[in-house]
Amino acid sequence: AGKTFVIQNIAASMSLKPSKVLLLDLDLRKATLSKALDKDHRGVAAYLNGKVEDYHEHIDVISEGLSVLPVGKLPPNPAELLLSDRFQSLMESLKKEYDYIFIDCPPIDIVADAAIVTKIVDMTVFIVRAGLLDKRSLPLIETLYHSGKYNRMAIVLNGVDIESRRYGNYGYGYGYGYGYGYGNSSEE
C-alpha cells in the first residue's frame, strides 16, 4: 500500500516546519523502514532487549530536523518487547525530545504488535492503495472509525491514477499497509 513511502514523505515534510521529527521503525518482524533507509544494522530492538542502555546511540540523523531510529537486528519476541517497561520508558522519553514521531509497524490484523502500539499513539493512519481495496470493505473501515478504538483515525489514499476514471476499488494493501503517527505538537 506504500505505508513506508507515505510515512517517510510525511515525516520529511513535517521536518521542514521546522520541527524535530523522528521516524521510528517498530516493524520488529520485517523492518521495512530500516531497509528502505539502509539502516538495518543497529537499532531499537537492542535497547528494548536491554543489550544497549542508551537508545540515542542508535538514532541516525537523515537531514536537519529529521532522524530515524531503526529496528536493528530482528528480535525473536516482538510483542513481548512492545509490552515491556523499557518500551513505555522509551516512548515517554522520545515524546519529550521530538515534536512528531512517525511509527512504522505491522498491520493490525496480522500480528499483535500494532494493536499494542495503537494504545500509545496520538493518531492512527491507515494507508490504502487505489485499486486494491474493494469498495465493499468501506463499511468495515467506517465501523473501525466509529468504534473509537484508534486515536484520531485517518486514511491516506495512495497510488491514485488521476488519469483513470474507473471507480469501485480503493487502496488497501493487505499486509503491510498501516502507518502510525505520534506527535505532541499543540498545532495538531
Positions of PLM-derived features:
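P-loop NTP-binding module
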Residues: 1-188
